[in-house]
Amino acid sequence: MDQVLYSSYIIKIPVISRISPSQAQLTTRLNNTTYFGLSSSRGNFGKVFAKESRKVKLISPEGEEQEIEGNEDCCILESAENAGLELPYSCRSGTCGTCCGKLVSGKVDQSLGSFLEEEQIQKGYILTCIALPLEDCVVYTHKQSDLI
C-alpha cells in the first residue's frame, strides 16, 4: 500500500492500479460528501456549530409543569427523555398519534410526520416524537384522546 498525505490525514491507497494524487483527492472529497454530508467547498469543513437552545415547557394532564432544554436537531420526546421525563410514545416516526401534544405557544417543525391532518395541525396539535422546537414552546402533553 502507498501512503498519500493530504492536509493533516493519511490515506492508504492499494497499489492495484496507480491512482494519481488528484484522483485520490477527488475520491476522498466525494466519499466525505456522500457518506458524511461534508464538503470542503462550503467553507465550513471541519467546523462544529452549536445549535441554539430552546426552552420547552411541558404541561401534564394534572397541570404539572416541567421545563426542558431542546434544539432544532432533537425532537421534544427525545429531549424530555434526556431530561428524565416519561411521555407516551409508540412509533417514534410520526405515524401513530400516541405522543400527541398541543402546542399553545412557540413554533415547531414537524414536517416529517404523516399522521396529523392539516386541520389538526392548525389547531396546534403536534407529535412530540418528530416535533423539533424552532422557538421556546409550551406544550400540553397526553392529547391523543383529543384526536379521536
From Swiss-Prot:
Record's GO cellular component, any one? chloroplast
Q: Where is this protein found?
A: Plastid, Chloroplast
Say yes or no: keyword Protease present: no
* Tissue expression as described in the entry: Expressed in leaves. Not detected in roots.
Keywords recorded for this protein, A-Z = 2Fe-2S, Chloroplast, Electron transport, Iron, Iron-sulfur, Metal-binding, Plastid, Transit peptide, Transport
A GO BP entry is: electron transport chain
Domain 2Fe-2S ferredoxin-type span(s) in chain numbering: 54-145
The family line of this record is:
Belongs to the 2Fe2S plant-type ferredoxin family.
What name is this protein filed under?
Probable ferredoxin-4, chloroplastic
Organism of derivation: Arabidopsis thaliana (Mouse-ear cress)
Lineage of the native species? Eukaryota, Viridiplantae, Streptophyta, Embryophyta, Tracheophyta
As recorded in Swiss-Prot or TrEMBL, the protein's gene is named: FD4
